[in-house]
């Protein structure tokens, strides 16, 4: 039975999802910012697509600021955290207005879920000392929001999404157990050959 269901599911996925897009971009969120890579498979009806993405976040402290050190002549960050998160998310986009809008943009609703690998380094010392043996944990995560695909020449597109990033932690990291918040997600995509 499992083999039969696997065969049906794989046939459904590969037969109906012919357009594959690869992309990269930036994320700007309540807890920090980062970069990501993504892969999207669009259904032949163009009503929905499946997504997978890997993100890299640099988490900022709420009181972190940059100052100028007159002694060294360098700018430096004060009050920062040595915390990185690597969310790996899978989900779908739903395009409710396919065939109803004549221009080259497509609004959508999106939901993604997955895991978040958190790396918590020491707060002081050199770069090597801070990241020599970081505390790690894997916790659930997700993203829910809305967005628009702007289709460009040459089968490329720019996607802009806004929504809620859900990043609860299994245990406290740097005094917090939840790094959830608003997120702006900008992606530059190109159809794979």
Predicted regions and their residues:
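Sec-dependent N-terminal signal peptides
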Residues: 2-13
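Short loop/turn motifs that connect adjacent beta-strands in outer-membrane beta-barrel proteins
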Residues: 16-21, 42-48, 97-106, 152-158, ...
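Extracellular loop and loop/strand-boundary signature of outer-membrane beta-barrel proteins
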Residues: 21-25, 73-80, 128-134, 170-176
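Membrane-embedded beta-strand positions of outer-membrane beta-barrel proteins
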Residues: 22-28, 37, 50-54, 90-92, ...
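Transmembrane beta-strands of outer-membrane beta-barrel pores
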Residues: 26-32, 54-60, 96, 113-119, ...
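Short sequence motifs at beta-strands and strand-loop junctions characteristic
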Residues: 27-31, 80-85, 101, 134-141, ...
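Gram-negative (and chloroplast) outer-membrane scaffold detector with strong preference
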Residues: 42-127
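Outer-membrane beta-barrel "beta-signal"
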Residues: 89, 178-193
